[in-house]
């Protein structure tokens, strides 16, 4: 009997929170995996150290100006160094069985599509991929016999609750939200909230940008759109509930009145491990819930005045086309301006809505055929329009 073939894996966004948790799981069983590609951003030391430890074929930094540093850090390791958007796509096109897509933002779309085109299972932690180009991504997966598995904790929870179920029997999907750093702040205080304050998540250990998106609930707005794309459910049947403990990740309601809930400690290794080992379940190094110690779980409806991003997500789902790409790009650029201290916390939603309104005034842009090029062009234009709106404010 021959030896079992190693499973070829790639991790895009390897130096971020999701990527590091994925590496943690893979490193516990290194003899089972052949690491093809790792990608990261500016943290060259971490990227190089992980590439050496996992003996990756190639390590890619998103920043071309850091290629020299990456090559120096990998000297003598036998790991190839590459940099820039084209290198990310080339790495995604390298044959792999399983690919983690954890690059933050729209930059994850092109390498994700490349992975699908070579038939890989794409573990999707990059929610922007479906928000910006859901129809394109799903059609690419279908055409090439590839598979998409959710890694967001909410969508993984829904996916697990639906095992063996008929989507026709699903009445509603409920995704939970912690409410973020400001969930209990008085509304009048939000205008003075800083990026540093927004980056303090009460439950999850995540990067700065996604933690701020949690505070504004732009993160949840993206997840609502992703739920529609991933599960093909009518937007009117997707609900959001604020759940401060972050122990219930999602619920699925059925037409017989049953409500199936998925519970687990707030540890992303749950969802990552499920996607990594699917369709099996294997032991994971995560805390087990002690319900008696937990005592109680709390839920409340989100406040529309506090979280206008949810209303904008509903508009995007109703509008369709390339509006998701506009929404995401405008959100990302508005977040840049908030982090830089140029706008207030409450200004982000207004800026995003203004850009959506401007695109709606020229519907030919939103209704253009969805291709990688049109998504990319729309993304760039939306960012430019955010900057133009900022310049107008300053003038």
UniProtKB/Swiss-Prot annotation:
Name the coenzymes or cofactors required. Answer: Mg(2+); Mn(2+)
Instruction: List the InterPro entries.
Output: DXP_reductoisomerase, DXP_reductoisomerase_C, DXP_reductoisomerase_N, DXPR_C, DXPR_C_sf, NAD(P)-bd_dom_sf
The residues that hold 1-deoxy-D-xylulose 5-phosphate are 127, 153-154, 178, 201, 214, 219-220, 223
Q: In which pathway does it act?
A: Isoprenoid biosynthesis; isopentenyl diphosphate biosynthesis via DXP pathway; isopentenyl diphosphate from 1-deoxy-D-xylulose 5-phosphate: step 1/6
Q: Which GO-annotated molecular functions does the record name?
A: 1-deoxy-D-xylulose-5-phosphate reductoisomerase activity; manganese ion binding; NADPH binding
**EC number(s) of the enzyme?**
1.1.1.267
List, in alphabetical order, the GO biological process terms annotated in this UniProt record: isopentenyl diphosphate biosynthetic process, methylerythritol 4-phosphate pathway involved in terpenoid biosynthetic process
The top EC class is: oxidoreductase
What this chain does, per the entry, is described as: Catalyzes the NADPH-dependent rearrangement and reduction of 1-deoxy-D-xylulose-5-phosphate (DXP) to 2-C-methyl-D-erythritol 4-phosphate (MEP).
Reaction catalysed? 2-C-methyl-D-erythritol 4-phosphate + NADP(+) = 1-deoxy-D-xylulose 5-phosphate + NADPH + H(+)
State the name under which the record lists this protein. Answer: 1-deoxy-D-xylulose 5-phosphate reductoisomerase
* Annotated keywords: Isoprene biosynthesis, Manganese, Metal-binding, NADP, Oxidoreductase
- The residues that the entry says bind Mn(2+) are 152, 154, 223
Q: Which SUPFAM superfamilies match?
A: 1-deoxy-D-xylulose-5-phosphate reductoisomerase, C-terminal domain (SSF69055), Glyceraldehyde-3-phosphate dehydrogenase-like, C-terminal domain (SSF55347), NAD(P)-binding Rossmann-fold domains (SSF51735)
Q: Which family does it belong to?
A: Belongs to the DXR family.
Name the residues that bind NADPH: 15-18, 41, 43, 126, 128, 207
């Amino acid at each position: 009997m021959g030896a079992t073939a190693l499973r070829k894996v790639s991790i895009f966004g390897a130096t971020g929170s999701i990527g590091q948790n994925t590496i943690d799981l893979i490193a516990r069983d290194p003899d089972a995996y052949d690491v093809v590609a790792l990608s990261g951003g500016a943290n060259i030391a971490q990227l190089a150290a992980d590439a050496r430890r996992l003996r990756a074929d190639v390590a890619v930094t998103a920043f071309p100006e850091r290629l020299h540093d990456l090559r120096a850090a990998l000297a003598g390791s036998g790991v190839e160094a590459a940099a820039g958007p084209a290198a990310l796509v080339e790495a995604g096109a390298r044959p792999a069985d399983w690919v983690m897509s954890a690059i933050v933002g729209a930059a994850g779309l092109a390498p994700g599509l490349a992975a699908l085109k070579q038939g890989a299972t794409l573990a999707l932690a990059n929610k922007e991929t479906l928000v910006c180009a859901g129809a394109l991504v799903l059609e690419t997966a279908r055409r090439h016999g590839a598979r998409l598995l959710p890694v967001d904790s909410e969508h993984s929870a829904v996916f697990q609750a639906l095992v063996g179920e008929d989507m026709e029997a699903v009445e509603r999907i409920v995704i939970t939200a912690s409410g973020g750093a400001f969930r209990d702040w008085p509304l009048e205080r939000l205008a003075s909230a800083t990026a540093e304050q927004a980056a303090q998540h009460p439950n999850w250990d995540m990067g700065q940008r996604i933690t701020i998106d949690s505070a504004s609930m732009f993160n949840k707005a993206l997840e609502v759109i992703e739920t529609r794309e991933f599960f093909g459910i009518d937007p009117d049947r997707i609900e959001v509930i604020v759940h401060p403990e972050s122990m219930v990740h999602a619920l699925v309601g059925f037409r017989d009145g049953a409500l199936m809930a998925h519970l687990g400690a707030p540890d992303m290794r749950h969802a990552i491990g499920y996607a990594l080992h699917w369709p099996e379940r294997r032991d994971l190094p995560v805390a087990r819930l002690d319900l008696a110690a937990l005592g109680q779980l709390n839920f409340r409806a989100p406040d529309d005045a506090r979280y206008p991003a949810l209303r904008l997500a509903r508009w995007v789902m109703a509008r369709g086309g390339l509006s998701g790409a506009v929404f995401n790009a405008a959100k990302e650029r508005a977040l840049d301006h908030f982090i830089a201290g140029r706008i207030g916390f409450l200004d982000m939603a207004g800026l995003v809505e203004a850009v959506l309104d401007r695109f709606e005034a020229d519907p030919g842009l939103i209704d253009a055929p969805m291709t990688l090029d049109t998504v990319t062009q729309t993304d760039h234009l939306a960012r430019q329009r955010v900057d133009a709106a900022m310049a107008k404010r300053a003038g």
